[in-house]
């Protein structure tokens, strides 16, 4: 059941941007990383500049008395919805899907009631920019790896499995990038299989997809639909069954998990989910996702949140997944996460 509606004052919609409604009936932009309005510079030099800015902020915070720092954090949470979502929900061990989505919009794309000066300042922080880069890089990795796979199997149904993805915005953006590169590759049935215990994120995801496939929108003409299944990654049996069924039907299967499975799940759950995706070499051909970095900057930042992230970094993660049937093929670095592309191995 959607959450009760909350008031939203009229605002000017940006040309060339799609909009969809949340469970609370708020109209917000649909992120399209191919649109300059949402794109973030993610080259090595830009990421390093963000890192240095974050280091400077961390050092200033370290010199500040703890009671004063806590007071400033509480004050920020009172003035900014976005800050409140990240800093005050002490009963939650992860950032909810739609809260995460809102901070990915970027300061210039915020709409009422999330567009106060405090919200805009918060959305411009380096750590938030890093989360936007995380989305952009995950979508790019997925699209880049899918391009040759789709070329080899024209017309085969494409199923994008999104684990813990909330709004599935990484899957949607991978499709947008593919459409812009080679539109003919999406001349096939496309299904986003959204596996998430949440309901608000998937509801928005379905509405976002409807907006994207509308006339003159980025995915206009694409035969795409979204299916939501409530899923707990600590019990991968439903995933195993889904992958086996899709493989038997001859589908092309790819998976992603941006800001979810590889960042929050235990080692055992990460391994079990990858083994389910592998399906004895007949399942997903590739997986894209984000891994929390384990450097000093990331660990220092985590002390200001209540989220139970698992700082591993790409190297430790690569060791962890040995034997699952996947290997790390490519890594893109952001501020607090490494985005990884996993390719299926051929076992003897």
Question: Can you describe what each PLM-predicted range is?
Answer:
Residues 2-153:
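Rossmann-like AdoMet
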Residues 120-249:
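Conserved adenosyl
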Residues 70-72, 110-115, 182, 246, ...:
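Short hydrophobic/aromatic-rich motifs at helix boundaries and adjacent loops
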Residues 110-115, 171-172, 295-300:
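Short acidic/His/Gly/Ser-rich catalytic and metal-binding motifs that mark active-site loops
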Residues 103-109, 164-169, 291-293:
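Short glycine-enriched loops at secondary-structure junctions
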Residues 8, 45, 52, 129, ...:
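Residue-identity detector for glutamine
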Residues 2-8, 12-18, 22, 58-69, ...:
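Alpha-helical subdomain
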